[in-house]
Amino acid sequence: SLQAATEWLKANNQRGFLGEMGAGSNAD
């Protein structure tokens, strides 16, 4: 459960971080 959450965070932080950077730049 904890390991799955860690792997999920790793995958989603990479996509989410890049997504927020791109979307944030475009939005602003």
Swiss-Prot record:
It catalyses: Endohydrolysis of (1->4)-beta-D-glucosidic linkages in cellulose, lichenin and cereal beta-D-glucans. GO terms for molecular function: cellulase activity. The active site is at 20 (nucleophile). Transmembrane segments: none annotated. It is found in: Cell membrane. One of its GO terms (biological process) is cellulose catabolic process. It comes from the Eukaryota. The keyword Membrane applies. GO terms for cellular component: plasma membrane. Keywords: Carbohydrate metabolism, Cell membrane, Cellulose degradation, Glycosidase, Hydrolase, Lipoprotein, Membrane, Polysaccharide degradation, Zymogen. Belongs to the glycosyl hydrolase 5 (cellulase A) family. This is Endoglucanase. It comes from Schizophyllum commune (Split gill fungus).
